[in-house]
């Protein structure tokens, strides 16, 4: 089946007298209501596309299937690409962790908890699986042909831990060598993975400075049994590093990394350092995809 993810590709496809079956993904097609008339769309699916009433009628009349977004849910049924940090953290301004609760990512998490992690209404469960399927599709498009190193676990590792620095240095070195770094997208060892990739275009001394800054915890929290990610300023410290060491467009393109977190563990904010975030509702699907991405090397940390 063809996958159409741009209006140029859609227009070329539409010029055929009988378009081949295609998945039309997350496109705004409201201006095409006239061109959609009298076409046959048997076998084609329109996923999360913006359509006017006339366009929808023409597609259904032509034998196509429309899967729209749910107006009662905050997330789309289908995405044609992975999330970015700016998208998930929209609404967060760099303050304490309570301020993170105003962002888009946490809005979805609250909705996730309200509907239930597992025993959900049928429509909600269906839309979650559709969303996760599109994340997997976008993930595989991104890693295709790449040399991948994946690191999972280790969410309890503190930023001041020597292993955090070692992982960041290794990740930076591998990223510069052309490997695509992938992690579970959470705190600890996973965050170190993305921090290393984040600084691949900068001198290592700057990364060392950043780690020294990001690892300073509030003194009252040092004896806490909860992980460092429970610190009220955990995210703010990382956000300050992003602000003080911004990445250029070329760095983002040349040194990408992918976080694969889940709303199932949504109490842990995702790391703000990867260029791409493949966030899932289903933890089992997320774990399965993390193990099946054919990584050249796979590392897992305890804790």
Where are these regions (language model features)?
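Short glycine-rich or small-residue beta-strand-to-loop segments that form or flank ligand, phosphate
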Residues: 47, 149-154, 181-183
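Long, compositionally biased, glycine/small-hydrophobic-enriched stretches that function as flexible linkers
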Residues: 1-125
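Short, charged beta->alpha transition segments
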Residues: 129-142, 286-288
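Active-site donor-nucleotide binding/catalytic segment of nucleotide-sugar enzymes
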Residues: 144, 148-157, 174
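Glycine-rich phosphate/diphosphate-binding loop of Rossmann-like nucleotide-binding domains
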Residues: 161-162, 172-177
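Gly/Ser/Thr-rich loops at beta-strand to alpha-helix junctions
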Residues: 51-53, 156-158, 182-191
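Short boundary motifs at domain starts and secondary-structure transition points
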Residues: 36-37, 136-144, 249
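Acidic/glycine-enriched connector segments
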Residues: 10-33, 37-38, 42, 47-50, ...
């Amino acid at each position: 089946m063809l996958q159409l993810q741009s209006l140029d590709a859609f227009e070329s496809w539409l010029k055929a007298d009988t378009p081949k079956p295609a998945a039309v993904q997350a496109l705004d097609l409201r201006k095409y209501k006239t061109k959609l008339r009298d076409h046959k769309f048997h076998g084609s699916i329109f996923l999360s596309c913006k359509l006017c009433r006339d366009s929808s009628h023409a597609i259904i009349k032509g034998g196509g299937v429309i899967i729209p977004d749910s107006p009662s849910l905050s997330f789309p049924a289908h995405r044609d690409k992975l999330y970015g940090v700016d998208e998930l953290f929209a609404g967060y301004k760099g303050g304490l962790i309570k301020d993170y609760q105003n962002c888009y990512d946490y809005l979805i998490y609250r909705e996730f908890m309200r509907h239930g992690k597992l025993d959900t209404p049928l429509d909600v469960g269906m839309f979650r699986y559709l969303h996760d399927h599109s994340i997997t599709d976008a993930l595989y498009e991104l890693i295709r042909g790449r040399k991948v190193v994946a690191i999972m676990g280790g969410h309890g590792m503190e930023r001041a831990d020597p292993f955090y620095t070692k992982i960041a240095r290794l990740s930076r070195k591998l990223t510069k060598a052309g490997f695509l770094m992938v992690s579970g997208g959470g705190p600890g060892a996973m965050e170190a993975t993305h921090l290393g990739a984040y600084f691949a275009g900068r001198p290592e001394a700057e990364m060392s400075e950043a780690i020294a800054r990001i690892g300073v915890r509030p003194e009252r929290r040092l004896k806490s049994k909860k992980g460092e990610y429970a610190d009220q300023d955990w995210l703010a410290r990382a956000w300050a590093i992003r602000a003080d060491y911004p990445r250029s467009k070329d760095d983002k393109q040349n040194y990408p990394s992918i976080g694969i977190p889940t709303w199932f563990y949504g109490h842990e904010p995702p790391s703000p350092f990867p260029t791409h975030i493949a966030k899932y509702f289903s933890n089992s699907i997320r774990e399965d995809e993390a193990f099946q991405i054919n990584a050249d090397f796979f590392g897992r940390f305890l804790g």
